[in-house]
Amino acid sequence: MFNLPSAVEITINSLNSAGYEAYIVGGCVRDFLLQKTPFDYDIATSATPLETEKVFEGERIIETGLKHGTVTLIKNGMPLEITTYRIDGKYHDNRRPEDVTFTKSLEEDLARRDFTVNAMAYSKKTGVVDIFGGRSDLKNKIIRCVGNADRRFKEDALRIMRALRFASVLGFEIEKDTKKSIFDNRFLLKNISAERISSELSKLLCGENVKDVILEFSEVLEIVLPEIRGMKGFEQKNPHHIYDVLTHTAVATQNAPKETALRLAIFFHDCGKPDTFKLDEKGVGHFHGHPIKSCEKARCAMGRLKFDNATTDLVLTLVKYHDTAIEPIEKGVKKALNKYSPQVFFKLLDIKRADNSAKNPKYNNKSEIDLLEKLAKDILSNGECFSLKDLAVKGKDIINLGVPVGKEIGNCLDFLLRAVINNEVQNQKENLINFLKEKKLKQ
């Protein structure tokens, strides 16, 4: 028996008491069976939207999708989508049905859903309703379309990305007929909006099994990520590498922390390598300037997929500097903390670790990355100076020395910060002023 939130139970009971069927359906049933806490709850009912509104008269209801039979009830602060059992009409844009027909049959409603693991329903009265074998597929870790796979993907091509996402996140295999249909219908992804693609892609990249999905379904993913094409099978011909560019990328992506910006950054970090490849006289491959080229390509991809500005800026910074060396001594780390900010610095270390994990183990530099992290944490915990805001003198102190207001004030502050970072002077106001007078203002 599922432990439903009280708001969900009350809602189902209210519909039942008014003479209507009501079940939780879809992903929340799947999650319960996987012993996970559902993120949200969808309710399917035999009541029409107007009948649902009448049952909950006086309560807060938002008419979120009346055309498709959906209203959202706010119950005890929890939003619950309540949708009438329906049969979808014709799809003409590979995205959504032009119209729907309401039905009194739960089976007909479940038959229109994407995958068997998402086509189950549950109520306390009936237990799990599983008409299409979803429970068995969950147990066997299989993603299988409900009914005809070609029809499902032609109805809504985003289901292709959803299948890959479930394979990545859940670690499930995609059933052979469903898999064949994914490859056959992959070009339909061109009809899907960038926002819907990027939402699924973000979840896919953060999956446990993302490496296998990238490698097995690269032909599918390259429809939305053409950057993959040049990476696939591109041998690096360098002793530091044991994989081609795409395999290296897939392994590194799986080993990066599960954060959207980090996974996107590591996915794009080497996409510029094929464009910068040069063989030296010894037959060794080099990729001088590849971070800049990768950054350019990542900028195009992030814009095309309409990611938000904050995510895009972070991804591009991480891609641009992923291969930049940081001297593993205190002053080197202080310079990096000042350049990137502490937050970005630690994310950059995450990228370097993931990148390192997918290289030749002979050249593993994990210990150096660990040292960089330790030095940074010590600097921060000790409150040491690495940025202008930490400096013991401010602009007004420089002005009081007779330096005219303007660009020279900033030059003096930068001069002092460099001196503090290089251990030429202690970060104390009197020391800094004397140092400035002696070393710079005399000149």
Can you say where each PLM-predicted feature lies in the sequence?
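Catalytic cores of the polymerase beta-like nucleotidyltransferase superfamily
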Residues: 1-443
